[in-house]
Amino acid sequence: MKLSIFFVLFFIAIAYCQPEFLDDEEDEVEETLPVAEEGREKSCITWRNSCMHNDKGCCFPWSCVCWSQTVSRNSSGKEKKCQCRLW
């Protein structure tokens, strides 16, 4: 549901933009986007210990899912793992 609302708002924003504005923005984005995305991917694709302090928005538009798992087969200790997921 959140994803569909995002796309609707995204397309509305594009529909109201001036073509000259989009051309200028595309040039700027092409220069900075690969570096920003590469840095974000490296920091976001990691296991987390909690979903708090997700200030980089790594999981958007997905959600952060956490669960507990045992450390090893013969151990009763558990550790918390978190990951960004679509479901």
Swiss-Prot record:
- Disulfide-bonded cysteines: 44-59, 51-64, 58-84, 66-82
Q: Sorted alphabetically, which keywords does the UniProt record give?
A: Calcium channel impairing toxin, Disulfide bond, Ion channel impairing toxin, Knottin, Neurotoxin, Secreted, Signal, Toxin, Voltage-gated calcium channel impairing toxin
In the UniProt record, which is one GO cellular component term? Answer: extracellular region
Query: Which residues are trimmed away as propeptide when the chain matures?
Result: 18-40
Known tissue expression? Expressed by the venom gland.
Q: Where in the cell is it found?
A: Secreted
Please quote what the entry notes about the protein's domains: The presence of a 'disulfide through disulfide knot' structurally defines this protein as a knottin.
Q: What protein name is recorded for this chain?
A: Omega-lycotoxin-Am1c
To which species is this protein native? Alopecosa marikovskyi
